């Protein structure tokens, strides 16, 4: 039974950590081939949003005529005009703004990893962890094999979170023109604000994960891995269980980052 788990960990660790090393710490640029479908959907949403501005102007006129008889309708003609212009510009320039935001988030995430004395290459680090897991497994130590399996499962969850994050990013890109047009009226402004929190949140996830990885590398990982028997984690005791537990802790914190960010996205929208 222990041999079966070892074969499972060995066969699964390489492709899973290959996924993690190549994807998890970044977001594809807005002009990348992966974002072609998102750009196409953004163009469709832009057409719909620009068409709906006629309806928004009509609703704004109705709010002006009702005066202050409706909640959130305290609006002057000047404020309505400023809101309409701002919403129109935000809707039609949203793709450019998102592109700059992605570049900024990628650059900030990279800065956390490459700044300081020890530069961290997530690709090299993932390869080392995958090799380290294989060397830590012992035919006579089933518990270490189960811990190694837990590391592989958590790494798979981290890759799955990346896929979900990119999917949500593409949805937010596609919905940007329609969501931002709701800045035009006070009654619908909350929808546009929710979009801003959403796009900020999905980009903040990779930055926070990079910060966690950089901090963990400085505190837990060996600065001279070649001097401690090839160990990745920087504890000279060579305790395999402790190495695996530290890897599990690191991956668990990185997996929890999206849920912490999600709270900040949704909480302001709650009554």
Predicted segment positions?
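Binding/recognition "hotspot" determinant
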Residues: 1-52
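Hydrophobic alpha-helical membrane-insertion segments
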Residues: 2-12, 86-107, 197-211
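Selective recognition of hydrophobic, aromatic-rich stretches within alpha-helical transmembrane segments
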Residues: 50-57, 163-167
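Extended serine/threonine-enriched, polar tracts that run as long, contiguous segments within proteins
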Residues: 176, 180-182, 187-202, 206-207, ...
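Alpha-helical transmembrane spans of integral membrane proteins, capturing the lipid-embedded, hydrophobic core
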Residues: 56, 60, 80, 84, ...
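Non-cytosolic segments of integral membrane proteins
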Residues: 45, 87-171, 175, 214-263, ...
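Membrane-interface segments at loop-to-transmembrane junctions
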Residues: 38-41, 73-89, 188-203, 233-238
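Hydrophobic transmembrane alpha-helix segments characteristic of membrane transport
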Residues: 52-88, 175-189
């Amino acid at each position: 039974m222990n041999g079966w788990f070892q074969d499972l960990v060995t066969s699964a660790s390489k492709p899973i950590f290959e996924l993690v090393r190549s994807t998890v710490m970044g977001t594809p640029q807005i002009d990348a081939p992966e974002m072609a479908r998102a750009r196409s959907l953004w163009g469709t949403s832009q057409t719909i949003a620009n068409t709906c501005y006629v309806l928004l102007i009509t609703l704004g006129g109705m709010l002006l005529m009702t005066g202050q008889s409706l909640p959130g309708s305290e609006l002057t003609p000047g404020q309505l005009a400023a809101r309409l212009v701002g919403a129109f510009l935000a809707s039609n320039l949203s793709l450019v703004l998102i592109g700059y935001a992605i570049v900024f988030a990628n650059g900030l995430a990279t800065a956390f990893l490459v700044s300081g004395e020890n530069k961290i290459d997530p690709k090299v680090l993932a390869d080392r962890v995958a090799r380290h897991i294989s060397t830590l497994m012992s035919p006579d130590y089933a518990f270490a094999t189960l811990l190694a399996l837990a590391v592989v499962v958590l790494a798979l969850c981290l890759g799955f979170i990346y896929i979900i994050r990119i999917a949500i990013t593409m949805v937010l890109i596609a919905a940007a023109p329609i969501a931002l047009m709701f800045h035009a009226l006070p009654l619908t402004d909350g929808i546009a604000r929710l979009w801003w929190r959403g796009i900020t949140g999905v980009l903040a996830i990779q930055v926070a994960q990079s910060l966690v990885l950089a901090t963990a590398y400085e505190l837990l990982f060996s600065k001279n891995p070649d001097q401690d028997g090839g160990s990745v984690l920087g504890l000279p005791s060579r305790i395999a269980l402790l190495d695996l537990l530290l890897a599990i802790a690191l991956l668990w914190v990185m997996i929890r980052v999206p849920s912490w960010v999600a709270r900040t996205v949704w909480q302001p929208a709650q009554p």
